[in-house]
């Protein structure tokens, strides 16, 4: 009886139903992963889109530079 008084509220649940720990650990992992994905997903996607846009703009600049020749300043004078 003294031991039960010293236990926390969650320890009583685990002692009364041992399957609860298994169920909780089985469900908690995927739920935490889903929560992290929902929180950090938009940030990761935003960084990825920004990186791809930077690379595409760099390729566009390279294509434009290849089409046109640069003029020397001495020839224009």
From Swiss-Prot:
Protein keywords: Cleavage on pair of basic residues, Disulfide bond, Fusion of virus membrane with host cell membrane, Fusion of virus membrane with host membrane, Glycoprotein, Host cell membrane, Host membrane, Host-virus interaction, Lipoprotein, Membrane, Palmitate, Transmembrane, Transmembrane helix, Viral attachment to host cell, Viral envelope protein, Viral penetration into host cytoplasm, Virion, Virus entry into host cell
Cytoplasmic membrane side: 46-77
UniProt PTM comment: Specific enzymatic cleavages in vivo yield mature proteins. Envelope glycoproteins are synthesized as an inactive precursor that is N-glycosylated and processed likely by host cell furin or by a furin-like protease in the Golgi to yield the mature SU and TM proteins. The cleavage site between SU and TM requires the minimal sequence [KR]-X-[KR]-R. The R-peptide is released from the C-terminus of the cytoplasmic tail of the TM protein upon particle formation as a result of proteolytic cleavage by the viral protease. Cleavage of this peptide is required for TM to become fusogenic.
Transmembrane segments: 25-45
Segments on the Extracellular side according to the record's topology features: 1-24
Any one Pfam family match given in the protein's UniProt record, by short name: TLV_coat
Domain of life: Viruses
Motif window: YXXL motif: 68-71
This protein's GO CC annotations: host cell plasma membrane; membrane; viral envelope; virion membrane
Swiss-Prot/TrEMBL GO biological process terms: fusion of virus membrane with host plasma membrane; symbiont entry into host cell; virion attachment to host cell
Annotated InterPro entries: TLV/ENV_coat_polyprotein
Chain positions of site Cleavage: 61-62
Function: The surface protein (SU) attaches the virus to the host cell by binding to its receptor. This interaction triggers the refolding of the transmembrane protein (TM) and is thought to activate its fusogenic potential by unmasking its fusion peptide. Fusion occurs at the host cell plasma membrane. The transmembrane protein (TM) acts as a class I viral fusion protein. Under the current model, the protein has at least 3 conformational states: pre-fusion native state, pre-hairpin intermediate state, and post-fusion hairpin state. During viral and target cell membrane fusion, the coiled coil regions (heptad repeats) assume a trimer-of-hairpins structure, positioning the fusion peptide in close proximity to the C-terminal region of the ectodomain. The formation of this structure appears to drive apposition and subsequent fusion of viral and target cell membranes.
Protein's name in the database: Envelope glycoprotein
